[in-house]
UniProtKB/Swiss-Prot annotation:
GO terms for biological process: D-alanine biosynthetic process; peptidoglycan biosynthetic process. This is Alanine racemase 1. The keyword Isomerase applies. Keywords: Isomerase, Pyridoxal phosphate. Catalyzes the interconversion of L-alanine and D-alanine. May also act on other amino acids. Pfam families: Ala_racemase_C, Ala_racemase_N. Its EC number is 5.1.1.1. GO terms for molecular function: alanine racemase activity; pyridoxal phosphate binding. InterPro entries: Ala_racemase, Ala_racemase/Decarboxylase_C, Ala_racemase_C, Ala_racemase_N, Ala_racemase_pyridoxalP-BS, PLP-binding_barrel. The keyword Acetylation does not apply.
Length: 386
């Protein structure tokens, strides 16, 4: 238990981040690697994770929104940072001030960026988004879109730094749709080349493609979930890339009580003691990202043993049954998500229980939970968001 933070924390292993990045660097055939650190590095803390990525093989970073990019710049990150999504024109001053590379998917938008850059007498670098099969932002791969991008290339104070797309099903065994997307991407790029449009980097290789599709490793690849030690699905060949999970969510036992047969635990009386039971309370709940959907289904690791989560998970607390566990004490450390010795209960396990993906599970861990950064087995930093 740490003295200056509440007894719920997420340990982030910086050595494992470095290891994963090095493994990805070896796997990727691209000269450049764009480390995706959107959503606060998938809940791991972008300001603290980004430097480790850059020290171990990443050349660039990608975020989803302008505030994420600004936070990185203010922390001292100087490498190219691109925004994968939309930025309102009302925030264009921040794009300019912090030298951010903006995604573009319409001529009108690019024209306004060009005008803003011209007024400031600077040059903006942009990335062209191409929708090859996701059905979200991006130019469609048509002759009309080729002409639109050609017009963008002629705008003043604008450099097309990159062109990119995103695979919809590259993490599935059947790669037919993925190859169809790749074909559209290559066609569009070749049409641009015919018009002598200079583009420095192409990037379409996401986590699954980095692992299984070397033909998608153009000038850059764009790893996301694999940076954080998880695979994009159970259908990818995990032998292609050895990864180490980075986050371990922990807490401490804060209360222990004996309950009699017939007594209930938590809201809704969903758990009834069928025997004399020893129940421990943990100070973690769904406001911390420990979703209520895990109620009565999850387990935790305590003193080398599993203990079931019983009753409904509350906003700030939950209960576990420790009746069959030896000598649990108030203050004992509990692993909610992660590994301890030979036991583990991971984001993959949680995702399977609640019917989602590991991405969502790790992104759910809220900023009410302090991040404790570990290097060489020692705490090197504690970040309290609130």
């Amino acid at each position: 238990m740490f003295r200056h933070i509440r007894p719920v924390w997420a340990e982030i292993d910086l050595d494992n981040i470095a290891y994963n990045m090095q493994q990805i660097r070896r796997c990727s055939k691209s000269d450049e690697i764009i480390g995706v650190v959107k959503a606060d590095a998938y809940g791991h803390g972008a300001v603290d994770v980004a430097p480790v990525l850059l020290e171990n093989g990443a050349n660039r970073l990608a975020v989803a929104v302008i505030s994420e990019a600004v936070e990185l710049r203010k922390s001292g990150i100087q490498c190219p940072i691109m925004i994968l999504g939309y930025t309102p024109l009302s925030l264009v001053d921040s794009i300019i001030k912090y030298s951010i590379e903006q995604t573009v998917f319409s001529y009108d938008y690019a024209e306004k960026l060009s005008e803003a850059a011209r007024q400031k007498n600077i040059t903006l670098r942009i990335h062209i988004a191409l929708d090859t099969g996701m059905g979200r932002i991006g130019f469609l791969p048509t002759e009309e879109s080729v002409w639109e991008v050609y017009k963008i290339s002629k705008l003043s104070n604008i450099i097309i730094e990159g062109i990119f797309s995103h695979f919809s099903t590259s993490d599935e065994t059947n790669k037919e749709y993925t190859y169809a997307q790749l074909k559209k991407f290559e066609w569009f790029y070749n049409e641009l080349r015919k018009k002598n449009i200079k583009i420095n980097i192409r990037h379409i290789g996401n986590s699954a493609a980095i692992m299984e599709l070397p033909e998608t490793h153009f000038e850059a690849t764009r790893p996301g979930i694999i940076l954080y030690g998880y695979y994009p699905s159970n259908e990818v060949d995990k032998n292609k890339l050895n990864l180490k999970p980075i986050m371990t969510l922990k807490t401490n036992v804060v209360h222990i009580k004996k309950m009699m047969p017939g007594e209930y635990v938590s809201y809704g009386r969903k758990f009834k003691c069928e025997r004399e039971s020893i129940i421990a309370t943990l100070p973690v709940g769904y406001a911390d990202g420990y979703t209520r959907m895990l109620s009565g289904k999850a387990k935790v690791i305590i003193n080398g043993n599993y203990a079931p989560v019983i009753g409904r998970i509350c906003m700030d607390q939950c209960m576990i049954d420790i009746t069959d566990l030896p000598s649990v004490q108030v203050g004992d450390e509990v692993v909610i998500m992660g590994e301890s010795d030979d036991k583990k209960f991971t984001a993959d396990d949680m995702a399977e229980i609640i019917g989602t993906i590991n991405y969502e599970v790790i992104c759910m861990i809220s900023k009410r939970v302090p991040r404790v950064y570990i290097k060489n087995g020692e705490v090197v930093k504690i970040r309290n968001y609130v």
